[in-house]
Regions:
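HhH-family (HhH-GPD) DNA N-glycosylase catalytic core used in base-excision repair
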Residues: 1-218
Length: 218
């Protein structure tokens, strides 16, 4: 799933490219030693305090460190279906989004295709429109994204989402009309909305009930 120019995973370490005010770009490394998460800022020259705090917030969201693991375990282990899986893999957390907009675009790219194909499309999108960075919403809003090799409806959905976020008509924050606004976009269905609620909004009640893999496992 990793985008080569933006992120990498190796030896229990996640590396992410980040935009920095004073030097353009840098890399942060997040490592797990079995009991603690460590963030290495050594490749972020002249990083500001605000930028450092923002990165820490993103790391907490991505790795779901605020989840009350013990309480979650206690509730799920009592379930007749989930209990067995909880015993097999205790302490699993829901991975969050480093960037909500990026995750939304990648969710649409991933509709009805394999993970490998979705990653291939996302990599092409970064190369063609972002020059190695994930393209800004304003840039994607005026692109014919389908030219990368996907159904036109899906490409138009990405452009519509990018335009809506850029113009402020859409948001990626919890709001009573979140699902209503996103479902009104052609090419956005319940799976995408529930995925965003789960990964971006960190909604504990979100569940992609119509996901093919989930249905197969259940």
């Amino acid at each position: 799933r990793a985008l080569p120019s933006l992120e990498a995973v190796r030896d229990n370490c996640y590396r992410r490219r980040v935009a920095l005010r004073n030097c353009g770009w840098g890399w942060v490394s997040i490592a797990w030693d079995g009991s603690h998460i460590y963030i290495d800022f050594s490749e972020c020259a002249d990083i500001t305090r605000d930028e450092r705090e923002d990165i820490v917030r993103r790391v907490r969201r991505v790795f779901d460190t605020d989840a009350q693991a013990a309480a979650i375990h206690e509730h799920l282990i009592a379930d007749s279906v989930l209990g067995t899986w909880v015993v097999e893999a205790p302490g699993l957390r829901v991975p969050g989004a480093w960037d909500g907009y990026e995750t939304a675009v990648r969710a649409i790219l991933g509709q009805q295709v394999s993970v490998a194909r979705a990653t291939e499309l996302a990599t092409k999108l970064v190369q063609e429109y972002g020059a190695g960075h994930f393209p800004a919403a304003a840039d994607l809003a005026r692109r014919e994204v389908a030219e990368l090799g996907m159904p036109g409806r899906r490409g138009r959905a990405i452009s519509t989402v990018a335009r809506g976020l850029d113009e402020g008509r859409l948001s990626l924050s919890a709001a009573p009309d979140f699902a209503e606004k996103w479902l009104a976009i052609e090419g956005i269905g319940p799976w995408t909305v529930n995925y965003l609620r789960l990964r971006v909004l960190k909604d504990p009640d979100a569940f992609p009930h119509n996901d093919w893999v989930v249905l197969k496992r259940l």
